[in-house]
Amino acid sequence: MLHFILVLVGGAIGSGSRYLLSLHITRTYPGTFPYSTFAVNIIGCLLIGIIYGLAERFQLAVHWRLFLATGLCGGFTTFSAFAYENILLLQNGNYTAFTVNTLGSCMFGFTAVFLGVMLTKISI
């Protein structure tokens, strides 16, 4: 139960941080390009890299990994987890899985969003 609470609290902090940062970036850089999402995804990738790097170097306890990586970064952006998992695939020499995961996630993700939007336009 403690692990669940740690992920929950970390997720709340990550989500709140994403919201505040997105507001700031959108106000600072208005326009059609999604600067806030782009920035959040890149910052999240940097954070999860730092967290997992420090976790390995200093044998960080599992509850800290859950709070910081799964909770905080997961609430901030799931793109960071996607990027980290792909790095692991590359490091393990699993190039086929890396390619399938990268291309598949992008293609199916975009397709799923498109289908979701289209489903909202169907008259019942």
UniProtKB/Swiss-Prot annotation:
Its main location: membrane. Na(+) is not transported, but it plays an essential structural role and its presence is essential for fluoride channel function. The chain crosses the membrane at residues 1-21, 35-55, 70-90, 98-118. It catalyses: fluoride(in) = fluoride(out). Keywords: Cell inner membrane, Cell membrane, Ion channel, Ion transport, Membrane, Metal-binding, Sodium, Transmembrane, Transmembrane helix, Transport. GO terms for molecular function: fluoride channel activity; metal ion binding. It is a multi-pass membrane protein. InterPro entries: FluC. GO terms for biological process: cellular detoxification of fluoride. Pfam families: CRCB (PF02537). It comes from the Bacteria. HAMAP family: FluC. Belongs to the fluoride channel Fluc/FEX (TC 1.A.43) family. Fluoride-specific ion channel. Important for reducing fluoride concentration in the cell, thus reducing its toxicity. This is Fluoride-specific ion channel FluC. It comes from Cytophaga hutchinsonii (strain ATCC 33406 / DSM 1761 / CIP 103989 / NBRC 15051 / NCIMB 9469 / D465).
